Amino acid sequence: MSFAPPPDYSKIYLALGCGLGLGFVVYASRVNHLPHVGDNTHNLPHGGQYCDGNKRVLYSGPKSGSSPTNNLWPFITVIALTLAILLTSCPRRRVCIRCSQHH
């Protein structure tokens, strides 16, 4: 019969979680979400133009309508509607004027 304490794996899980978190942060900071514009030799992700003897590329860049702040309105609307439904569907127990009890 062994009186040794069971092995503590919490430090392994902590190191694994930190490594995965750091890997996700590095991946998220390096990934390119801009649309691919151009061909295999000419890349214009921020807008611009290119012209040579047999091809012409004109790209004006990402529009202001595609900003991440415009994507927040549906989320805010869903949260507001959910709160409104929850607040209106709560049973309100009113106090009786005559006996001061909830009915």
From Swiss-Prot:
The keyword Cell membrane does not apply. One of its GO terms (biological process) is transport of virus in host, cell to cell. Residues 1-8, 92-103 are cytoplasmic. Residues 30-70 are lumenal. It is found in: Host endoplasmic reticulum membrane. The chain crosses the membrane at residues 9-29, 71-91. Its main location: host cell. TGBp1, TGBp2 and TGBp3 seem to act together for cell-to-cell propagation. TGBp1 is the main movement protein that physically cross the plasmodesma with the viral genome. TGBp2 and TGBp3 would facilitate TGBp1 function. This is Movement protein TGB2.
